[in-house]
Each structure stands twice: as C-alpha cells, then as structure tokens.
A protein has these predicted regions:
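Non-catalytic connector elements of ABC transporters
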Residues: 1-68
Length: 68
C-alpha cells in the first residue's frame, strides 16, 4: 500500500482496547508507546491484534494505523 503521508513509524501492537463504537490501540515504536483512537470497525476490518506489525501514520491532524 502506498501513502502520501511521510511520517510513517513501524511498530508493534501492544494493546487493543475495544469499546462499543471506538477502540484504543497502543503501538510500541522503539522505546515509545503511541496511542491512537480509531473506530472499532477499523480494528475489525484491519484484524488488529496484540503482536501485529503495523505502521503508525502521523498527519498534522490525526494519527492513523496501517497493517500490511
């Protein structure tokens, strides 16, 4: 998948906290943890789970998560 966003950080999913509508995903990037709040549907569509290798995509207005 190609993205125009340049701030892409490879990391590993540490935790996924599912709510009724939204979810909180915690990703380890090096020694740091980055949290992103995304829809529960996005977590399900991506099949995100602890241990998954992902990329955190940072834009000026949001933080997204990508799974290859």
């Amino acid at each position: 998948m190609s993205l125009s966003a340049r701030n892409q950080l490879p990391g590993t999913v540490e935790q996924v906290h599912l709510g009724e509508i939204m979810a909180r995903v915690v990703v380890r990037v090096g020694e740091n943890l980055i949290e992103s709040v995304i829809t529960r549907q996005s977590v399900e569509d991506l099949g995100l789970a602890q241990g998954d290798e992902v990329r955190v995509v940072v834009k000026s207005t949001e933080v997204m998560i990508q799974k290859d």
